[in-house]
Amino acid sequence: MGIKIQEYHKEYLKKSWNGDTPFDVDVKMFQLDAVNTSYVFGVIDDGYLVHGYFGKKICGDDLTYLLRLEENPWVPKTNMRDKGTFMDSAAFEYPCHGTGDYREPCLMVMDDEGMTTTDLRYQSHKVYKGKPALEGLPATFANENEAETLEITCIDKHTGLEAVLVYTVFNDLDVITRSVRLKNTGKAPLNVKRVLSMCVDFDNDGYDLITLNGSWARERVIERSKLHHGKQGIDSVKGESSHQNNPFIALVSHNADEDCGEAYGFNFVYSGNFFAQAEVTQHKYTRAVMGINHFDFNWLLEAGEEFVAPEVVMVYSDEGIGKMSRTFHDLYRQHLIRGEYKDKRRPILINNWEATYFNFDTDKLIGIAKEASKLGIEMLVMDDGWFGHRDSDNSSLGDWFVYEKKLNGGLKYLVDEVNKLGMKFGIWFEPEMISPDSELYRKHPEWAIQVRGRELTMSREQYVLDYSNKEVRDYVYGMMKAVLDSANIEYIKWDMNRQLTEVGSTSLPKNRQRELWHRYVLGVYDLMNRLTTDYPHILLENCSGGGARFDAGMLYYSPQIWCSDDTDAIERLKIQHGTSICYP
C-alpha cells in the first residue's frame, strides 16, 4: 500500500499512412495502491499527465504499457516531433480546454486578453504522510499513520496558472480522494470559468451508470442505465445539492449486483451546485468527471490568489455494489463525521411540528413532553414558530429571539421543565433565510441575495440571506449564540426550505458576482463550523425541505441528516435504499 514512483525511457510506434515508425518517450510513473485497488498514471516527456489504470490491485515493475499513447492523423497534436500526444484520444489525468481535446474538460481559464486556452504541464511532485485539510471546505481526514498523499504541481507557462492535483490513498480502505488547488503565479488577473475536481478516463464503455434522482419526498431513488455514445450525467444549479440529483455517480459492470461485478463510485464532498458526467467517445472510451458546476460560475484570481476546489471520493470494488457501499460507509464513519456524536448513540426524539404546526405554547409543549417521556422518548425538539412573531410561514425568519406570547415564562423555563422529565431539549433554526416581514429585513434589506432593480422571487414566503457577506454571518451567529447560551439546548435542527434565485450580492463587486454561488456555500460551512466548534456537545442535524442537502459536505458538520419528509413505511424503503448506496 502507498505511493510508488518510477522513471523509464520507452520506445513506441508512430502509426501513419506510410507505416509504423518508432519514437522515444521519457515516462515518470505514479502508482497509488490501496488495500485492493491500484490507480496508475504517468508523465510523458512533454509534461502531460496521462492516465493508465484504475481498478483491482496490480503488481509489476514496469506499468508503462498501461498508458494510452496513440497516434491518430485526424486529430491535433501538440508538437512536431511525432511523440504520440494526440489530444482527443489520450487518457488525460486532468484535461484542459483549448488544445484539441474535444471531450469534457476539467479546467478552463480566461486570461486578461479574453483567451480561454489552458495548457497545464507537469512541473514537480511531492509525497508525504497523512492528509491535508482543505481551507474553508469539508473533506475527509487522516493522520500520518492512516494515509499518504501525492501532490502533482502543473503550470501553464503562458498565463502563470499553477494547478496542484492532490491525491490521497488510505491505508485500510479502497479509497482514493482527489482535489485541486489553483494559484495565479502570473502578474495579470485570470478568470476561472470551470474547475472540476476529478477526471478518470476508462479504456472501454462496458458500464452502467448509477445515479440517485428524485424529488421532494422521493429523494435518492436509484436509477441505472447503460452507457451510450455521448454524454450522460446529473447536476444541480439550485445552490444546494438538491432533491432532484445527488452528487454521487457509479460506473458498474453490466453484470454487477450487490455481491458480484466491478463498481466505481464517485462522491463529491460539497453542498452546492455540482456537475457529474460520463461521456462515451467515438473510440468507445469513457470519461468520468465531477466537480463544481460551471453553469453561471466564474472565479477571479488576481495575482498571487488561490482557489481550492472541493474533494471527490473515489471507491473501487470488484465484489459488487454492496462492497462499494460498505467502503463509503466505513470511510465516512471513520474519516468524515466528527465530534462527540461520531460514534455515539443519538437520542430518540419527538418533534412537535406535525402535532402543532405553528399553534403551540409552553403548556402544550410540556404536555407533549410528558406523554413522550412515558414512552421512553429522550428529547423534545421545538420546531418552527418559537421566534419573532411567527404564527405562520410569512414572517419573522431572521428574528431569532423568543416569541414571548407563545413561550410564556421564557425559553429557559420551558427547557428546565422538559429537563425535569429526564428529557433533552432541541430547537429549530433556519439560519440562511429572511422574511420580508421581519425586523431584520426592515433594517437590512440589502442582506438578501438579490439583483439590484429586479423584483425578488418569493418562495415559501421568504428570501435567502447573502452568506458571502461576513457581516451577515456574524449577525446570525450572534443571534443564535444568544439563544443557545440562554438555556440547556442540546440539539439543533438546521433547516433550509428554498433554493437560490436572482443570484447577486450587494457586498461583492461587479467582477466577482458570479462567485456568489460558491461563496454562499463557503459561508454556510463557515457558520456551521463556528457552531460545532463553540458548541461541541450540541447535536447538529441538517435538513433541507426533507433531504435536499443530504451530501458528504453536510456530514462533515452534522453527523445526522434528515433523510426525507416522506415517512411512509413503504415509500421510505426506496429512499433509505438509495441513500445507503453511498451514505452510512
List PLM regions with ranges.
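Catalytic domains of carbohydrate-active enzymes, especially glycoside hydrolases
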Residues: 364-387
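Polysaccharide-binding surfaces and accessory modules of carbohydrate-active proteins
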Residues: 5-13, 23-39, 49-279, 295-297
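Acidic/aromatic-lined carbohydrate-recognition and catalytic surfaces
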Residues: 388-441, 529-533, 537
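Conserved, mostly hydrophobic/aromatic
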Residues: 36, 180, 304, 350, ...
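An active-site-proximal structural segment forming one wall of the substrate-binding cleft
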Residues: 371, 375-377, 465-495, 523, ...
